[in-house]
Regions:
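Pocket-lining segment of extracytoplasmic ligand-binding domains
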Residues: 89-90, 169-173, 177-265
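Conserved C-terminal helix/tail region of periplasmic/extracytoplasmic solute-binding proteins
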Residues: 299-330
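Bacterial N-terminal signal peptides that target proteins for export
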Residues: 1-9
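Secondary-structure end/capping motifs
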Residues: 227-309
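Short, glycine-/small- and polar/acidic-enriched structural segments
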Residues: 25-166, 170-176, 180-187, 204-206, ...
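Surface-exposed patches in mature extracellular/periplasmic domains of secreted proteins
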Residues: 103, 162, 246-257, 315-318
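Bacterial N-terminal signal peptides
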Residues: 9-19
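Short, surface-exposed acidic
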Residues: 157-161, 263-275, 312-320
Length: 330
């Protein structure tokens, strides 16, 4: 009798193992490429992975760090990865030039773009920027919208001195006193400099003074959207849950990211970055909506601004459907 029970138990375990393996084989292998090396903004996707939200949707998810939104857009367009998390303005420029990609959900609906400096500079509003030296990176998204920000706030470009450099050079210019401010994202550069120096920074957000563009979102190839819309829907469903869980427990989200990538950064800095990101998920119009659900007028206004200042053909104005679909976040 005992021998029979032992055989039955072993058979049951084997059956469960087989069922588990079969279930794993049935999951869709999916790669999400981020826009950059890990920082706090990326934490929700790792929390979704840790909590099994993607697994529950039949997705075996791998998250890859990126090397800039441009590279992420190229990888999605080429079919090297299924999804990308990227700057939507960068995607719009690529799509306008023929890249077969589209956004399927907008996470950052308020732009993190800002002019920032140390708090002791007492720069709290656009007028305080007059007479200051600002470090910029020529050709990036911030530098393209900087003249618009100045114009809307009645500041002549000649009233502000600029120095040029990449992200590291800009940070060093501010830290070393060669510049009063730099153009950067409030959820990225700001916490890094605060960690580096131990001094508080203050940011003047473009979005608070007339220049708001939708920022980062999930992108997919038009081929994937057409051939496997159900996969896109499942991925977005899991991602929406992941962001909602992050808002409730940001510390857990940071811990989940560090579990996968222990070298992602200082936990405190990552948490500061995430805390600065969460308020960017919604505008006043979408504050009661779920994550990734954006107002179409905000997509349209961003496209218009990109057409006017970002190098996109003016013929693209108003053609929101070429760049974004709300089908998968309903």
């Amino acid at each position: 009798m005992k021998r029979f029970q032992r055989i039955l138990a072993l058979a049951t375990l084997a059956l469960l193992a087989f069922a588990g393996a079969a279930q794993a084989q049935q999951r869709d292998k999916v790669v999400l490429m981020l826009n950059w090396y890990n920082y706090g903004e990326h934490a929700p996707f790792y929390l979704g992975l840790d909590k099994g939200f993607y697994r529950d949707e039949g997705i075996d998810l791998e998250i890859q760090e990126g090397r800039g939104s441009g590279a992420t857009v190229q990888a999605v367009a080429a079919g090297s990865v299924q999804f990308g998390y990227a700057d939507v303005g960068t995607m719009m420029k690529a799509t306008a030039k023929g890249a077969p990609v589209k956004s399927v959900g907008i996470l950052l609906q308020k732009s993190p773009m800002s002019a920032m400096g140390f708090a002791d500079k007492n720069i709290t509003k656009p007028a305080d920027i007059v007479g200051k030296t600002v470090a910029v990176t020529p050709g990036d998204a911030l530098s393209q919208l900087w003249p618009v920000f100045l114009k809307l706030n009645k500041i002549e470009e000649s009233q502000v001195k600029t120095v040029s450099g990449d992200a590291t050079t800009k940070r060093n210019a501010v830290v070393n006193g060669q510049a009063d401010m730099l153009l950067g994202n409030v959820n990225d550069q700001k916490p890094i400099i605060e960690e580096q120096t131990g001094k508080p920074m203050r940011a003047v957000l473009f979005a608070d003074y007339g220049v708001n563009t939708i920022n980062a979102g999930i992108i997919a190839s038009k081929d994937l959207i057409a051939k496997n819309p159900e996969l896109v829907r499942r991925f977005m469903r899991a991602s929406m849950k992941a962001v909602e869980a992050t808002v409730k427990a940001p510390d857990d989200a940071v811990a989940a990211m560090l579990k996968v990538n222990p070298k992602a950064g200082n936990p405190k800095t990552l948490k500061t970055s995430l805390d600065a990101t969460i308020p960017l998920y919604h505008t006043k119009e979408t504050e009661k909506a779920r994550p990734f659900q954006v107002e179409l007028k905000d997509v349209s206004s961003t496209l218009d601004m990109m057409s006017q200042y970002g190098g996109i053909d003016a013929a693209s104005k108003g053609k929101v459907d070429d760049y974004y679909t709300a089908e998968f976040v309903k």
